[in-house]
């Protein structure tokens, strides 16, 4: 510890104190931390292995209930008239146009959703009183909601389909954008009521004033709840849409384009922290709300065309 910079040493002492440790002997405290950290890593891998084994058991037990794989049909040489070729080419173009339209919308969803690793993480660090919640718990919120909410949402979709009121995939994506926008609208209104300045200005306030104005942990829980529901409306259903719309000869390429859209959305993530540090926080969240709302509007404007193409 003698070689550590004074600021780094002060941060280390603050972390140890907040965790209930003793700063009398930093060597002992650091050793205890490393021991707990290493044990946690081992338990996480054990949990992963156990989950994979359970999945494998479920697969073998349920194998008889799976649909019979389609048999491969021998390739045949088929000749088409010029009119048939033109019609097929036109259909492929329509399908690709529809695919690129949806991918364009999805870029802005991932740009907003993946702020959970950028501006939302900074918000949790700077504006949320997370002393009662361990960091690893925050990391588990989204996966927990995915596991808990997926059966519920799928049951709702299945129930609507049985009643003849099935919602098309393009409409589900539009609804997902609305739900994502709701998460950011909630954050914007909350931040406006609290009167939060930009992150840079907030850090200049006295520590006591910062602590007094920090948000409760439930704010992040509510935000991640809405964002996870939006993810369930868009991510798996969007990939399913790609499989339905993509020409069979280009299925693999089109699924790769879905991942490319995700990558493009991630390339825009830097904009979030830029606004977060420079603008009042409510303005930052309002931008994401508008992005989601506009994307939803564009998607709804294309719904009938997309539904026609998928049929």
Stretches found by the model and what they are:
Residues 243-276:
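A late C-terminal transmembrane helix in Major Facilitator Superfamily
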Residues 232-246:
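Intracellular juxtamembrane helix-capping segments at the cytosolic ends
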Residues 171-234:
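C-terminal transmembrane helical hairpin of 12-TM major facilitator-type secondary transporters
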Residues 107-111, 144, 182, 189, ...:
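Hydrophobic/aromatic residues within the transmembrane alpha-helices of Major Facilitator Superfamily
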Residues 1-132, 157-165, 302-311:
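Intracellular loop-helix junctions on the cytosolic face of multi-pass helical membrane proteins
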Residues 37-40, 120, 126-148, 166-175, ...:
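Loop-to-transmembrane helix entry
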Residues 57-61, 134-163, 175-187, 265:
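Transmembrane alpha-helices of Major Facilitator/SLC transporters
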């Amino acid at each position: 510890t003698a070689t550590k910079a004074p600021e780094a040493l002060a941060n280390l002492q603050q972390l140890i104190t907040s965790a209930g440790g003793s700063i009398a002997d930093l060597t002992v405290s650091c050793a205890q931390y490393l021991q707990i950290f290493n044990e946690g890593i081992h338990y996480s891998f054990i949990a992963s292995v156990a989950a994979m084994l359970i999945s494998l058991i479920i697969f073998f037990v349920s194998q008889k209930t799976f649909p019979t794989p389609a048999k491969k049909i021998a390739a045949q040489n088929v000749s088409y008239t010029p009119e048939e070729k033109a019609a097929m080419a036109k259909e492929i173009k329509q399908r690709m146009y529809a695919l690129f339209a949806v991918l364009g919308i999805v870029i802005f969803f991932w740009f907003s959703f993946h702020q959970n690793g950028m501006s939302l993480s900074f918000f949790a660090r700077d504006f949320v009183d997370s002393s009662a919640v361990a960091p690893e718990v925050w990391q588990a919120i989204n996966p927990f909601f995915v596991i808990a909410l997926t059966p519920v949402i799928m049951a709702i979709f299945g129930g609507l389909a049985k009643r003849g009121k099935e919602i098309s995939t393009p409409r589900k994506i539009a609804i997902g954008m609305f739900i994502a926008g709701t998460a950011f609208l909630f954050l914007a209104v909350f931040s406006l009521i609290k009167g939060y300045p930009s992150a840079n200005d907030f850090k200049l306030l006295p520590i006591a004033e910062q602590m007094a104005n920090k948000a409760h942990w439930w704010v992040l829980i509510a935000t991640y709840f809405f964002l996870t529901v939006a993810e369930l409306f868009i991510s798996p259903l969007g990939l399913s849409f790609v499989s339905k719309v993509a020409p069979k000869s280009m299925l693999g390429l089109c699924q790769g384009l879905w991942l490319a859209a995700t990558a493009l959305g991630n390339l825009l993530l830097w904009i979030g922290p830029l606004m977060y540090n420079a603008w009042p926080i409510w303005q930052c969240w309002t931008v994401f709300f508008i992005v989601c709302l506009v994307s939803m509007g564009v998607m709804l404007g294309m719904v009938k065309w997309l539904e026609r193409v998928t049929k």
